A protein has these predicted regions:
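Short, low-complexity, polybasic intrinsically disordered segments
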Residues: 111-115, 145
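Glycine-rich, mobile lid/loop segments that gate access to catalytic sites or pores
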Residues: 118
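Short acidic, Gly/Pro-enriched loop/turn segments at secondary-structure junctions
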Residues: 138-140
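C-terminal edge-of-domain segments
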Residues: 142-159
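RNase III-family endoribonuclease catalytic core
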Residues: 2-112, 122
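Short acidic capping loops at alpha-helix termini that bridge into adjacent secondary structure
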Residues: 125-128
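Short, low-complexity, intrinsically disordered N-terminal peptides in bacterial proteins
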Residues: 1-2, 159
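Pyridoxal 5′-phosphate
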Residues: 131-135
Length: 159
């Protein structure tokens, strides 16, 4: 059995009047992520970590923001496609550890639903997914509520 680790990072600007997609759900907020797709920073981060672990490039390579077919796309669809790619190479997820950096809103109450949705998309157990949240203590673009960022580390295995 071999083990591979991947790391992902993503940032999206927050803008008033947009839905705030995070972890596959809409989180109530006055702002939402600005992006070519639905701007789900957590799913994009996980996709990048998985693709990196499997040495398959990054999310931009597979789903370019210049391609019309990805305009406004639900990021859960992208995640499912990434899972096909890594499974085609013989990999399975060991675990995912992620952190969302966001000043507001407090997202703790939404994390269980995010984990459930992500587990369904990836066909893994909820216990294989960790989602944490933190602020930047009002520092940087996150602290000024101009954007949201996320980090993820994944372990994949191949028998």
């Amino acid at each position: 059995m071999s083990f591979r680790v991947g790391f992902g990072f993503d940032v999206h600007q927050l803008k008033a009047g947009l839905d705030f997609w995070l972890g596959g759900i809409i989180v109530p907020h006055t702002k939402g992520g600005l992006g070519h797709s639905d701007a789900d920073v957590l799913i994009h981060t996980i996709c990048d970590a998985l693709l990196g672990a499997a040495n398959l490039g990054d999310i931009g390579k597979h789903f370019p923001d210049t391609a019309a077919e990805y305009k406004g796309i639900d990021s859960k669809i992208l995640l499912k496609e990434v899972m096909v790619l890594i499974r085609n190479k013989g990999y399975e997820i060991g675990n995912i550890d992620s952190t969302i950096c966001l000043q507001t809103p407090k997202i703790g109450p939404y994390i269980p639903e995010m984990k459930k949705i992500l587990a369904i998309c990836m066909d893994v157990d909820v216990d294989q997914i960790s989602i944490k949240a933190t602020t930047t203590e009002k520092l940087s673009f996150v602290g000024r509520e101009e954007g949201v960022s996320a980090y993820a580390t994944v372990l994949i295995t191949n028998e």
